[in-house]
Amino acid sequence: MTTANPFAQRSGLEYELPPFALIKEEHYLPAFYEGCTAQLAEVQAILDTPGAATFENTIVALETSGQYLMRMLLVFYNKSSSDTNDALDAIEEEMAPKLAAHQDAINLNPVLFKRIKDLYEARESIGLNSEDSWLLERYYKDLIHAGAHLTQAQRDRLKELNEELSKLETQFSKNILADTNDLAVLVETVEELDGLSENEIAAASSVANDRGHEGKWLIGMVNFTGNPVLDSLTNRELRKKIMEASLLKANRTNENDNKPVLLKMVKLRAERARLFGKETHAEHVIAVQTAQHPDNVHAMLRKIAPAAVRNAQAEADDLKKSAGTDIESWDWGFYTEKVRLEKYNIDTTKMRPYFELERVLHDGVFFAASKLFGITFKERPDLVTYHPEARAFEVNNEDGTKVGLFIADFYTRDSKRGGAWMNNLVDQNFLFKQLPVVVNNLNIPKPPAGKPTLLTYDEITTLFHEFGHAIHGFLSQVKYPRVSGTSVQRDFVEFPSQVNEMWILWPEVVENYARHHETNEKLPQEWIDNLNAARTFNEGHATTSYLAAATLDLAWHSLNSEEAAKVTDVEAFEAQAIKDYGLDFAPVPTRYRSTYFSHIFAGGYSSGYYGYIWSEVLDADTVDWFKENGGLKRENGEHFKNTLLGRGGSIDSMQMFRNFRGRDSKIEPLLKRRGLV
């Protein structure tokens, strides 16, 4: 192993921030291969340890293994998501199947499994504290879930499946990015952009110039169905063109077509599930989530779907009255804004000057976190990050002790994948005495030089949401990296981030950040009242669109091997799956169509997209608790941190919720919030 590679040892920088000034593309693959070799040697040393397995010589030893590899992977996947290029794509393509094989070499090792199984069966008698006991249980159950208990022949086939699936996931993601960039809509005259703000028009011009279309305008695609510009563009033909382009992402029978990729993935996942003794991929995945079985998920979604569609149909009737014609999917956002203005006197374009990014970040997002948890934020421009637009902020407690580092990467670029997400560059843990380094990525259009970044209300929601994930990472106070921060079940992880959205319109918060960027005038109270009054406005559309995507995920992954083999027409399957739930309402397309549904075919959410609304049950109940207990108060934040946020994944998720709430969750607050009762 060479020490010339910057990943070979801890960086020694503040917060163990990776040494981005030293990291070059040629370092990734050597670090990957050397890191894999080093971890396999560390695991072999565990297996060669004389005498019986103990918690220290097996579980703690596993926790300390693989650090070289992990340092490289955390940096690489952050970079390849937020600032990729052809070289990084090629590295990921080479690395993905080999990483799957490396993980299988550890997870499917029968000798290692026996050591952990022996420990697990003796867990009551070996004097473990609660966190150690839970970690042991996590290791044992994760290995079972990974297939460690299978026969040799089954394990061999499992390795082949995992390797092939990792290649397909990488291809799926690559295809979307390429096709999304290619589908951007070129606009010839500025008159066609009527309705867009001056900043939006300037941004479209800048993008067009960057891509060689001087004197024209380019409307880029986003990761979900539709596009934010549809809310304000008056040109109906252009709206239609943008919507139709959006629906075609990775679905044009070209080299970026994801239909054959996802069909193969569905078949292989179904085959893999059967190896595990499960009939479907959904059954296998959900077994280790808080929902426990697909039937429980279906029951909840079917309870919500009819009311959501009824609300969407009623909303469409209102829009039709305003439009004077039948509403198509490309009309929905535009006439929604008109009706919102008529019903609630909410003009989102007039609000944007009050939502300047720096003000929202410092006086909204950071302000609320400071009030709740007593943490402070200070920008550190001296710290080198992975991209000039990625800004570092140190996070401290009120007494000056360090909490961690927050990296904010907010602007869209061609090299960044769509959507918004949180990830770690360093996981908090006491084992290595490491503080968290947390990244938030968004895709806010960058204004021309010298112009302010004025946010939409949806972008503010995304900013608060992703920072909720960041808080979950910051406030982690656990011993072991495996259970740090957001290392919880998929159908639980969205809950803390959703709770953080409650502070957007909290009086003390909104009056602090919603100021006109030129005059410093407060957002008029009448407008704030109207925003609160309109909370359930358009919820029929939002819920129906989301549920269609969630049911589509479940439909693909509820196929057994024989059923999966028979599916050849992706679009027909998609339409039938949505129709089976009664969600087939043409003006409201699914939030994601299959060919660009990255969450489930490239993002680790397969059979898990339901988790957003499953988590929202906990979120709505928690929001009620905050309101009942005085809202934005330090003692409330401390209770939330001590019982839940700070525990990471170190105890059972639902037990954490009970510790926080004092009881099991109730669905009624969610139904009320979404206007479903």
How would you label these PLM feature ranges?
Residues 445-464:
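Short pre-active-site segment immediately N-terminal to the catalytic Zn-binding motif
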Residues 228-229, 293-294, 417, 448-452, ...:
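Short small-residue beta-strand/loop micro-motif enriched in glycine and branched aliphatics
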Residues 12-27, 75-95, 119-160, 220-260, ...:
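Short His/Asp/Glu-rich catalytic/ion-coordination signatures at enzyme active sites or charged loops
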Residues 37, 41, 45-52, 68-82, ...:
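Intrinsically disordered or highly flexible coil/loop and linker segments, enriched in small
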Residues 131, 135-137, 159, 164-170, ...:
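Active-site-proximal, well-structured secondary-structure segments within enzyme catalytic domains
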Residues 2-196, 626:
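N-terminal helix-rich structural modules
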Residues 2-30, 34, 216, 344, ...:
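C-terminal, non-catalytic "cap/extension" segments appended to globular domains
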Residues 258-270, 437-440, 478, 647-649:
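Short, hydrophobic/aliphatic alpha-helical segments
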